[in-house]
């Protein structure tokens, strides 16, 4: 086994960075694998756009065309040179360090399950924020630039109040607390795991997103919702959709007769269920149809 097979890829790349073109050519010619590694890395670096780049070490070079950066280590990011094109920043579940050095280009920030640090120092460029299970600080510390807030895995009491700039509020799939009295009147879009009659959905909510919904007479959806997204429905009943709904989106597990959709629906989104379209006629009231 040669030394080139023993050394880590990052070590080899760092060695090459110190060589001029002549020495680099001689070095990589000693190992076909290293040649292809270097060639592949250069191709990646020259891509016009990289959607997601996972950063496994603070010393790694981040391609300038990266737009979504995922930090997979629990270390300060102060020494990381984050490219100006990065707008989405996601931290691993173990991350719980200072976020003082987040650049002002970030608009979407996702903090991991272990994070319980200061959030008042988040740059005002951030509009979308996700918090994890360990976050126990007051939500009022969140910068007023944030309009979309996701509370992930909360298993304890929420430390309010929710900032007045929040218009989109999401409670994660494993959120297990009552939301009664928690949704301010400035929130218009609400995402929750499951709806039941014990939940108090404020009448200022016009867009409701549900992971699952089981219809019965005692569990009817409120009649002031205009936009409705449902991922799972068990079972599907006739006229289970409020008459106020005009925009309707079904998830992957919807497989029902769409002719029962109320006449007020004009915009319909169906994900990976084409049998319901083949077997049934699309209602005449549908003016916009999106299939995934």
Swiss-Prot record:
<dbReference type="Pfam" id="PF05725">
    <property type="entry name" value="FNIP"/>
</dbReference>
<feature type="repeat" description="FNIP">
    <location>
        <begin position="95"/>
        <end position="134"/>
    </location>
</feature>
<protein>
    <recommendedName>
        <fullName>Putative FNIP repeat-containing protein L281</fullName>
    </recommendedName>
</protein>
<dbReference type="InterPro" id="IPR051251">
    <property type="entry name" value="STK_FNIP-Repeat"/>
</dbReference>
<dbReference type="InterPro" id="IPR008615">
    <property type="entry name" value="FNIP"/>
</dbReference>
């Amino acid at each position: 086994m040669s030394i080139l097979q023993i050394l880590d890829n990052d070590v080899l790349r760092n060695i090459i960075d110190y060589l001029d073109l002549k020495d680099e050519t001689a070095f990589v010619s000693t190992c076909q694998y290293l040649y292809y590694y270097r060639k592949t890395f250069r191709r990646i670096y020259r891509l016009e756009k990289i959607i997601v780049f996972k950063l496994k070490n603070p010393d790694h070079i981040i391609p300038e065309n990266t737009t979504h950066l995922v930090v997979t280590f629990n270390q300060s990011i102060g020494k990381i040179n984050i490219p100006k094109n990065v707008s989405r920043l996601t931290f691993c579940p173990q991350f719980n360090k200072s976020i003082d050095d987040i650049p002002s280009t970030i608009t979407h920030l996702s903090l991991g399950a272990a994070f319980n640090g200061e959030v008042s120092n988040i740059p005002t460029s951030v509009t979308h924020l996700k918090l994890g299970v360990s976050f126990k600080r007051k939500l009022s510390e969140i910068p007023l630039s944030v309009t979309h807030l996701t509370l992930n895995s909360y298993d304890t009491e929420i430390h309010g109040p929710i900032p007045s700039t929040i218009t989109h509020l999401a409670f994660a799939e494993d959120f297990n607390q009552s939301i009664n009295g928690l949704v301010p009147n400035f929130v218009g879009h609400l995402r929750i795991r499951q709806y039941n009659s014990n939940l108090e959905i404020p009448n200022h909510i016009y867009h409701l997103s549900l992971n699952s919904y089981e219809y019965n007479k005692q569990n009817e959806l409120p009649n002031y919702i205009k936009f409705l997204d449902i991922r799972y429905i068990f079972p599907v009943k006739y006229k289970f959709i409020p008459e106020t709904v005009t925009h309707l989106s079904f998830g992957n597990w919807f497989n029902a007769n769409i002719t029962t959709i109320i006449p007020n629906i004009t915009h319909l989104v169906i994900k990976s269920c084409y049998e319901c379209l083949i077997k049934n006629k699309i209602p005449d009231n549908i003016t916009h149809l999106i299939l995934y």
